[in-house]
């Protein structure tokens, strides 16, 4: 009986060892280009944007959190706006030149024309379908706003009037992404399907997910769509057949954390943020992956990855965590001679 129990313990240890080996199959990056930025908040941060001045930017988040930087994102100071409630959730921020917008819940839209020195509230109709969760500044007095049920509106007069871009909403969404040329992809609240829309269409086009795994997030790649599914799976649409998908990949097997967001730094270099401080990178457009293990000890889920320019990027995590891309670290690592 004692012998049997001993063998059971040995077998259990072997299983754990094999699982650990499986977890570590992803090679480590040769360098870490990310630095942890200290922030004066533990609020949930949701979006980041910079003005025409690359040193001047804003972070937004829950509990009406608004942070400002004047040194490119190394240091941030909190700003307090004169709102009727401090429980507003600032979901999205966007700038075009000196003009900026903040969209939030419930039913909040803020506008600035002086690079964020002052903000005014734009009245929204009580009949607006859903709450604003995404805003894109497109030029002087021009912006596009989307709500959490997929209603899309555009203004060309600084927010005085808004024109609906779709005839009907798509339903409650968990994620919504806009491409540079004005296309949208939205993931349903439960991740059971996704919808697409592009300028000129009257309505959203629904699509069934292509596997049994629920969709976590989606966005636009260089020549199509990318998809992150539950269980740490990543997939790209077929560049030659837009309605079809390439084979799914699972960069790191036997893990309990999920993949949450993806962003391209260059046409070939793409970063994925995940739960529990996990950060993956591919330098060949998503064919192979490496893991940045230097940030594993950061106690946060990395749920938003943003590259405003190839040398200006950020990873947003929960509990007030922010990583800043260090282009000099990357350049140094790629130019160092081999030992």
Curated annotation (Swiss-Prot):
Residues 1-22 form the signal peptide. It is found in: Cellular thylakoid membrane. One of its GO terms (biological process) is photosynthesis. It comes from the Bacteria. Pfam families: PSII_BNR. It is a lipid-anchor. Keywords: Lipoprotein, Membrane, Palmitate, Photosynthesis, Photosystem II, Signal, Thylakoid. A lipid is attached at residue 23 (S-diacylglycerol cysteine). GO terms for cellular component: photosystem II; plasma membrane-derived thylakoid membrane; thylakoid lumen. Gene3D superfamilies: YVTN repeat-like/Quinoprotein amine dehydrogenase. A lipid is attached at residue 23 (N-palmitoyl cysteine). Part of early PSII assembly complexes which includes D1 (psbA) and PsbI; not found in mature PSII. Binds to the lumenal side of PSII complexes. Interacts with YidC. A 7-bladed beta-propeller torus, about 55 by 55 Angstroms, with a depth of about 25 Angstroms and a central pore. HAMAP family: Ycf48. Belongs to the Ycf48 family. This is Photosystem II assembly lipoprotein Ycf48. It comes from Trichormus variabilis (strain ATCC 29413 / PCC 7937) (Anabaena variabilis).
């Amino acid at each position: 009986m004692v012998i049997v129990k001993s063998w059971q313990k040995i077998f259990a240890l072997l299983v754990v060892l094999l699982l650990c080996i499986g977890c570590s199959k992803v090679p480590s990056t040769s360098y870490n280009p990310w630095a942890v930025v200290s922030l004066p908040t533990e609020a949930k941060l949701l979006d980041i944007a910079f003005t025409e001045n690359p040193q001047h930017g804003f972070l937004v988040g829950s509990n009406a959190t608004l942070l400002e930087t004047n040194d490119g994102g190394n240091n941030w100071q909190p700003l307090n706006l004169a709102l009727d409630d401090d429980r507003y959730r600032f979901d999205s921020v966007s700038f075009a030149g000196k003009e900026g917008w903040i969209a939030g819940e419930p039913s909040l839209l803020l506008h600035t024309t002086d690079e964020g020195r002052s903000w005014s509230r734009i009245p929204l109709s009580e009949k607006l379908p859903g709450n604003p969760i995404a805003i894109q500044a497109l030029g002087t007095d021009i912006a596009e706003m989307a709500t959490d049920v997929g209603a899309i509106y555009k203004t060309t007069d600084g927010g005085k009037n808004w024109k609906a871009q779709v005839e009907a909403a798509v339903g409650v969404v968990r994620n919504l992404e806009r491409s540079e040329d004005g296309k949208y992809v939205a993931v349903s609240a439960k991740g059971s399907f996704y919808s697409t829309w592009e300028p000129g269409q009257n309505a959203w086009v629904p699509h069934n997910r292509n596997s049994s795994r629920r969709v976590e997030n989606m966005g636009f790649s260089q020549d199509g769509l990318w998809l992150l599914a539950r269980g740490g799976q990543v997939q790209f649409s077929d560049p030659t057949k837009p309605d079809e998908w390439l084979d799914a990949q699972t960069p790191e097997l036997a893990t309990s954390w999920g993949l949450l967001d993806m962003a391209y730094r260059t046409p070939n270099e793409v970063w994925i943020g995940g739960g529990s401080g996990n950060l993956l990178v591919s330098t060949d457009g998503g064919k192979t992956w490496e893991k940045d293990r230097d940030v594993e000890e950061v106690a946060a889920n990395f749920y938003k990855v943003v590259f405003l320019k190839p040398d200006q990027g950020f990873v947003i995590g929960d509990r007030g965590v922010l990583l800043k891309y260090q282009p000099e670290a990357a350049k140094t690592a790629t130019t160092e001679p081999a030992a």
